[in-house]
Amino acid sequence: MTTVSVASGKGGAGKTSIAAALAVAIAAMPEGKCIFADCDVDAANGAIALHARERERSPYFAGPGFSIKAKACTACGRCILACRFDAIRKSAYGQSYVIVPELCERCGACLDTCPRGAVVMYEKQVGEFFVADTARGPALVYAELEPGEDTSGKLVRVVRDRAGQLASETSVIVVDSAPGIGCPVIASLSGADLVIIVVEASASGIRDARRLVDLVRSMKRKAIAVMNKTGLSAEMDARARTMLAETGIPLAGEIPFDPALRAIEESGNTWLSIGGDMGNRVTDTIEAVKGVILAMQRKEPCAATIKEKL
């Protein structure tokens, strides 16, 4: 089993589109089995990119939640004094208190201070995770975290574990990471055999990609890069290539900016469906990345499609 994580330093770089195209290309291979793990649990959209059909749904629980039993509460106010997050308010009738879930940090101070035992602790559901079939071939595992909830890194681990259960020894798991370099990204990159860094050819894209490179290096992961939205600025294209050369990240390919790519996605297809010269550029890039993955599975130190050692 080979795990490939696709990441970018910022949102909107084209990470999910490239990850979806790669997963479809791998699934189309003879004997190819691919699992797409959408680990952007705060805003998963892999199901849209791959036209997913849900076949399994499971709740995700993370830590305790707290509530106040109105009949047991005497409104003594001790819980309000103990709460440092202003999460406890008077009820609509003013005869008891209630906990505002969106403000509660689940520290348990209210539970410890209530003399009447009116505060109760329960296991709180903060999201769901899913398994789905797709119209393009790869199975999809993804999750949805409730707005304002934490533990996104743990939910990423749940998604990856479920993907691993579906995979076989010869499978490739394509992990679509969240943007940035935060906790869910670290959880997405952990244990990956290869990281594909999607670099948007813009000032913010290059700067944020450099931060991601530093993270990948600190985690001792092998990495290659794909440049996206090239052709808009020769200066930005050159700066992106220079950054990759200075950091020693092999460049697998470049995909120029083209509004037609958006139209392809809106029609329900991946970027592999576009024709013409743009289609050749996309296909060449995806094939180069796929070549690196196959070389790793064969225990080869480098990929002929890139001509550089990882």
Feature roles, as predicted:
Residues 32-47, 123-129:
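Short beta-strand-centered segment that lines the nucleotide-binding/catalytic pocket of NTP-utilizing
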Residues 144-152, 203:
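Flexible beta-alpha connector loops of hexameric P-loop NTPases
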Residues 116, 123-131, 154-254, 263:
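Conserved catalytic-core segment of NTP-binding enzymes
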Residues 103-142:
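Hydrophobic alpha-helical segments and helix pairs
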Residues 215-310:
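C-terminal lobe/tail of nucleotide-utilizing enzymes
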Residues 67-86, 98-118:
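Cysteine-centered iron-sulfur cluster-binding motifs in ferredoxin-type domains/subunits
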